[in-house]
């Protein structure tokens, strides 16, 4: 059986935290900021943790990420 390759698109989008969870950035942060409130833009700056439902699939794609 060949080795599992890391999904490079996922590797660029997710980082593993110290406790083993996966951190992601928010969507809606690339353009069209004039239509968004200051509160929404401020909340989008912070990272978020990947939900439990998506965690298993993404973890499999990032098999070799330390």
UniProtKB/Swiss-Prot annotation:
It comes from Bacillus velezensis (strain DSM 23117 / BGSC 10A6 / LMG 26770 / FZB42) (Bacillus amyloliquefaciens subsp. plantarum). The lineage of its organism: Bacteria, Bacillati, Bacillota, Bacilli, Bacillales. InterPro entries: Ribosomal_bL35, Ribosomal_bL35-like, Ribosomal_bL35_CS, Ribosomal_bL35_sf. Residues 1-26 have a biased composition (Basic residues). This is Large ribosomal subunit protein bL35. GO terms for cellular component: cytosolic large ribosomal subunit. Residues 1-45 are annotated as: Disordered. It comes from the Bacteria. It holds the Pfam family Ribosomal_L35p. GO terms for biological process: translation. Keywords: Ribonucleoprotein, Ribosomal protein. HAMAP family: Ribosomal_bL35 (MF_00514). One of its GO terms (molecular function) is structural constituent of ribosome. Belongs to the bacterial ribosomal protein bL35 family.
């Amino acid at each position: 059986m060949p080795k599992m390759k890391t999904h490079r698109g996922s590797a660029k989008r997710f980082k593993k935290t110290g406790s083993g969870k996966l951190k992601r950035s928010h969507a809606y942060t690339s353009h069209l900021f004039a239509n968004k409130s200051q509160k929404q833009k401020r909340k989008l700056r912070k990272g978020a943790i990947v939900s439990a439902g998506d965690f298993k699939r993404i973890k499999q794609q990032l098999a070799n990420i330390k």
